């Protein structure tokens, strides 16, 4: 049954929620995120459009190289579904706010947004989801991995020892956890699998913390567990979820044990250095939280100090960060724009994400306009995660890999839960 205001006193009242507040930050965040999302969706509708305008392809044609002729405006396999789904969602939304929907449909929508479950029901539901997930995935632990990076990583972990931590910049936290997994369980994949289970639990508890609704947490958990890209990399040794767990934990700890948040963020970096790029998103999240100002300053300053300390240490020990990251001599605009196309093909099996990312962002903006600050934070996280792919290809010689979209899927799932935080729309 729905919970009450007394049960969750920090939930805004309906009147407070409905009262719109002028918010320049909200508009800026929305414009940023919706722009990134729309550019990313171009390749879902027209897969060849961005690639066809690549200057490299044009240069090859000028040199007489015959390229395969591709129609830049040929629709992708998800194009019709994307347009239809978005049209239906936005029409229903407009009719709802214009009070033109049939009463039965309106009541059904209100029921979904106001529905809540008891702690007991939430515990049973979460436990059932975990049992199903673990039971379906545990068999993968006995299967030898076939990723190309696995052989090299296995050799590196076999030769790893704790005394190497201070000698070179590598993902030593990841090596340590894989080394520990082999030492304790005789299998490299056990602790990575436990990390994925932890990520599922964190998704639930983080969503509940943001929304004050257990039902929202269950919905977010279901969305994550149905994700193809999450299930593809949940037991992998080559592309573990350690970095995502530590990063999401750093955000969660801002509410639960704020002095430990920078520690968790620090651990995410030697799990995968790419989390350094999450730094601006972390600062914005801290800025929009409801903790006291002094706590915000301390957490933000500590997190900033971690980045600065890493840069200073690299300088002192002569570590070439450009070489580590594979940084190019100059920015490659062609590769930058091609980076946006990775969204369409890396997530081609995650139809839920492709079809509803645009309505989700619009929904988050509406929620932020009605006073829910966490909606802005989720927009920044979604937009930032999508922007990382083109930044990587534009500034480094690295290619975009599907596993890098796992944190995006996690925040997509949490964002859906955030929409359900509203008691009534």
List each model region and its residues.
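Transmembrane-helix signature of polytopic, membrane-embedded enzymes
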Residues: 203-226, 244-245
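Short acidic/glycine- and proline-prone juxtamembrane loop motifs at membrane-interface regions
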Residues: 232-240
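Membrane-lumen/periplasm interface segments of specific transmembrane helices
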Residues: 294-364
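Membrane-interface transmembrane helices that cradle and orient dolichyl/undecaprenyl
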Residues: 247-261
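Membrane-interface alpha helices of multi-pass inner-membrane proteins
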Residues: 259-282
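Hydrophobic, aromatic-rich transmembrane alpha-helices
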Residues: 199-204, 352-376, 415
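Short hydrophobic/aromatic helix or loop-helix immediately within or flanking a transmembrane segment
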Residues: 163-186
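Membrane-interface helix-loop-helix junctions at transmembrane boundaries of multi-pass membrane enzymes
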Residues: 208-211, 215, 293-299, 363-384, ...
């Amino acid at each position: 049954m729905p919970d009450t205001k007394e049960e969750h006193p920090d939930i805004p009242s309906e009147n407070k929620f409905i009262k719109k507040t002028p918010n320049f930050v909200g508009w800026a965040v929305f414009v940023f995120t919706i722009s990134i999302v729309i550019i990313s969706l171009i390749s879902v509708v027209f897969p060849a459009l961005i690639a066809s305008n690549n200057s490299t392809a044009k240069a090859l044609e000028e040199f007489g190289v015959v390229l395969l002729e591709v129609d830049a405006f040929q629709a992708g396999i998800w194009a019709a579904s994307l347009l239809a789904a978005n049209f239906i969602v936005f029409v229903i939304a407009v009719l709802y706010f214009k009070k033109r929907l049939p009463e039965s449909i309106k009541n059904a929508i209100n029921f979904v947004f106001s529905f809540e479950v008891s702690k007991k029901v939430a515990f049973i539901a979460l436990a059932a989801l975990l049992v199903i997930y673990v039971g379906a995935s545990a068999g993968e632990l006995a299967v030898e991995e076939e990723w190309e990076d696995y052989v090299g990583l296995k050799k590196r972990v076999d030769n790893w020892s704790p005394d190497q931590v201070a000698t070179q910049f590598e993902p030593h936290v990841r090596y340590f956890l894989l080394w520990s997994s082999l030492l304790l369980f005789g299998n490299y994949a056990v602790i990575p699998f436990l990390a994925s289970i932890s990520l599922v639990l964190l998704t639930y508890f983080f969503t509940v913390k943001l929304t004050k609704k257990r039902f929202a947490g269950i919905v977010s958990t279901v969305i994550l567990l149905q994700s193809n890209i999450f299930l593809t990399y949940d037991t992998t040794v080559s592309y573990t979820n350690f970095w995502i767990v530590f990063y999401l934990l750093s955000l969660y700890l801002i509410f639960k044990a704020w002095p430990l948040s920078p520690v968790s963020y620090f651990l995410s970096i030697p799990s995968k250095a790419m989390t350094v790029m999450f730094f601006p998103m972390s600062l914005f999240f801290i800025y929009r939280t409801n903790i006291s100002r002094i706590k915000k300053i301390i957490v933000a300053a500590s997190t900033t100090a971690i980045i600065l300390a890493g840069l200073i240490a690299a300088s002192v020990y002569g570590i070439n960060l450009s070489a580590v990251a594979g940084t190019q001599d100059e920015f490659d605009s062609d590769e930058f724009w091609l980076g946006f196309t990775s969204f369409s093909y890396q997530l081609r099996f995650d139809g839920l994400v492709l079809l509803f990312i645009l309505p989700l962002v619009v929904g988050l903006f509406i929620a932020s306009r009605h006073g829910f600050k966490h909606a802005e934070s989720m927009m920044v996280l979604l937009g930032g995660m999508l922007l990382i792919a083109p930044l990587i290809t534009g500034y480094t010689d690295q290619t975009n890999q599907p596993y890098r979209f796992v944190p995006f899927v996690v925040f997509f799932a949490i964002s859906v839960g955030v929409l359900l935080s509203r008691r009534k729309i």
